[in-house]
Structures are given as structure tokens and as C-alpha cells.
Amino acid sequence: MESAKLYINRCLQLARLGEYYVAPNPMVGAVLVQHSAAGDTILGEGWHEQYGAPHAEPNCIRHAEEAHPEGIDYKHCTLYVSLEPCSHYGKTPPCAELIIRKGIGRVVVGMLDPNPQVAGRGVKMMREAGIEVLVGVLENECRELNKRFLCLQEKHRPYIILKWAQTQDGYIDITRETRGDKASTPLVISTPLIKQLVHQQRAENMAIMVGTRTVLLDNPRLLTTHWSGRNPIRITLDRHRVLPAESKIFSNEAPTIVYRENTNWSFILQDLANRNIHSILVEGGTTLLQHILDSGIYDEVHIEVSNIPLPRTANQEPNGVKAPDYTPTTQPKVVNNHQIYIENLHK
């Protein structure tokens, strides 16, 4: 079992190489190992590299055959894969059929695929073909890797991360009214390093969401300017149809979804699930964030707390927007003298 854990852990490392490119598919890695009296030999490795492209298993087998043109004794090999091989025709042929056709003697699977089109059928096909199959090695780690994909499959909604930065005394911004004048300049709370990490978060999630007021006041582009990977799909609300057509959120740099007629949170989540969007990073203001917090439908909360308070007016009265009403229960990490709280509720 220890060697199985070692190889599945390697599968997880490989799977992460496709992190910014395979959504809404899961990240998957595979390792082909030949066993002999002299010990184990890794013949090939592979991962799911691009949405719509070959899966980890055929990539692994192709790599092994290219590296060993003399031929491979598949009967004495074990294929380690972090997620159950698929059993259906989609954008690619079934991986389970390829494994059977190659005559691989043993397969070790990190976790079953909850996709209704698979859901144990891949394992069943391989076992019926006489292949020894072990399931559930490092299952918790495999689930954590693909928490976004699993949320969409099991809860039929996107994985939701709420994020905001606040001052030491609990404000997310100064009070602002309009876009374009000096008074509308937002309060800068995050450090340059943390801003870069936020762009990494944008790349990790399929969509990013802000409210009407954020678009009106900040006119954000909501792209991954400071990180590699795809730009997220942009989502906003415009129930009163007040967003200017020239707003940067409507640029052709990334798709944008605007909810006007129905801004109910449950409806939005169902609609996004129907669009196969498996994750949302919510960077909105207090109104949107508090609405979602009050609904109880979210998975993670990320809060950055600055080491300085809100700038005060001459009479020392705070003139700012209060942060959402939320009390972290975890211990913070300290980055650039700012406290970072990461609350994970999906486990």
C-alpha cells in the first residue's frame, strides 16, 4: 500500500500541471509502472493537459511507448491514476477501453469519478475484463485536488470562494458615490504580493463575480493580468440596467455574463451549473458578499486584514464601507504584515 500511495501522490503532482487549462474537466495524472524481481520501473507518466484533449491515461501510455519502442509487457504493469478512468465517449474515447485493449494487468485508482456518465462504470468494465483494480488510495487528497469539479458533480452548483480585504478596524473601502472623480478612487488595502496571489486565484477558478456597485465605482477588468492561465468568465448583476456599455467588464478580453431579470442566488447557481461552470471567485462589495454569507451557500472564505485602520476625516469619524459581518474561526497566516484568513467549509 505504501508504494501505491507513493505513485498516486506522483499522479497528483502531475495532475496539477493541467490546473489552469482543463476546467471544467478534473485534473488527472497517471503513472505506468513495471514490476520485476529487480524492483519497480516507471515506464511513463501523463496528465490531462488541455480541455478536450487526450486524458491522462492515453498520454501516459503514449509516453511509455515512445520511451520504450522495444515493446512493453503490459500484463506485468500497474497503471496508477488519480481519478477513475472514463467509460464513455465524450470529446475523447473511453480510457477504460484503452486500458483493457493494452492488457494492463493491474490498475490503482485514487478515487471514483462521481460524473453520472462514469460513477464506477470504468472500474466495473476493467474488472469484468479480468484486470485487478484497487480503488481509494489517497482518496482525501484526490478529492481536495478536484474540489471544484466534485462540487459541480455532487452538489450541482459551482464551488464558491468569497474573498475580500479589510482594514484593521473592519472597513473594505472609503465611502464613494460616483466613478471618474477623485473621490471615487478606491482605498488600497492589499500589498503588491497579495494582489498577485489574487490573480492566481482568478486563474484557478472558472468565473469571477462582482456586484453592480463594484462595476459602477471601480470599472474593473477582472482578468489574470499578473498570473499565467486563462482569464475567468466575468459575472455581474444589473437588475436596474444601470451599467454603462463602455464598462471594462464588457471588453472582449473574456466572456461576461450579466444577470438582469433574475438575480436570485439559487437561480444564478443553477444557471451557472447548467453552463458547466464549476467554480466562482466572488470579489464583490459588502452587499453582495453579505447576501451570499447569509444564504449559507458557499465553500471558502478568504479574508485579508491590513495592519492599518481606515483613514479618518478631520473630526475623526470613520467614513467608510464596513466589511461583511463574518468572524473567522481559523488562525491567520501573516503575509507582508497582513493577516490572511482562509476558512474552508467544504470538507
Predicted regions and their residues:
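Short, basic/aromatic recognition patches
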Residues: 2-23, 152
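Short acidic amphipathic segments
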Residues: 288, 292-301
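Short internal beta-strands
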Residues: 105-113, 209-210, 234-240, 258-260, ...
